[in-house]
């Protein structure tokens, strides 16, 4: 244990820079963060640990693991945003440590450390780790499950049908009862996101067993006892919620948010079949530039030799590919769906990086990685100012600053790879990611918060609101506005006539709208509008019925 403490300490230090630094500085944003945070708060406040509640009403779309993890942190942290995100960030760190544990057990501590470091500094993984959502708790539990399973069934010593694979004394031991922990964490993964955990685990296990030419004794998998444990962990919650909510739970959770979400575009997340190819490059950035380490001078020969592949690598490849392929066939596609594929991919890349450090792979691979990494970094750096100019009100200077933080370390990585100094190139890429995260949190977060959240304008509305005065939105909807006003937004209006009718019933009220909506409102003769504040593209107005104003 002592020999692993320095490695764990280093991973914790990296996570402090990538995951926990200024964790609560960005307001809760998007559709999911405010809702999930509120549900966790209500779970703690009302003590309803079975049925998730939103404004006192059952919220049956997702299982409870995120809420269970998050609720206690509201008693620890004063900053709500930190409380809402600390659980997923902690899960991300545990995921990385499990990658280190798996890499150390199947290869070496160096390999495990490199794979875990790659994961902790991949921008997409960090982004989900810093978000208040169900994706990272699910990925954490699923990774723990697959890591335990891999160490139990993918060790060379377990393969009676693999005489060419040497087995050390340690590797030759049967996994025994310890493999049952994989099924416990699989049950927790089901409580993280639903039955998709079973589907992915079954696909990975079947794929590995088939490609490994049935080289594993299935008795060592302890499937019957394991699935009984999985059911014991997960089924009680499903039964309890069904007992309390009836077929509304079946309809909402299983049919709508699992079957229909996968088979149809009902939730408006339809994307092309190859959607996840560019998504993978983005999620693993800046490490996606290191993919040339996988190159081979004779790739077809390597594929034809698949029967001689290392079973450890076969397991990781199956683990990586199954979620990507499964969700590529789904009509609904979101980047977070393939988050479980990142841990094995990071470890595979760590294996090849470790080989490059030892000098056991061709030098052209490392040089090609340096070139591609520089190309990817330069592309992002050049695009950043234009993107910020277009999307964020002309704030190109922030994009330029971020571009510089990406490009300068990339040149160092490039130089080190050309000289064959792999350790320095690896370290430069880690620093590139950490520096980028630092500058994003320091300089981009205030701007992103203004455009993707409503914290400032919500607080302004509550500050200026008269007792009993309604708050509503016009041609605009944002979940965070409901969250930051304490769910005091009365209604959402989408046309001028509805706004005029509301003004006749309520002489004074506040409206949050976009800049375009403000132009419409100020041009209406039936009402009088006074601007009270703004945040990004949002405007806060006080509305009065013109007839009421004349009478007074």
Which residues does each PLM region occupy?
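Membrane-integral, polyisoprenol-dependent glycosyltransferases
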Residues: 2-362, 535-537
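Membrane-embedded architecture of ER/inner-membrane glycosylation machinery
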Residues: 180, 184, 294-546, 552
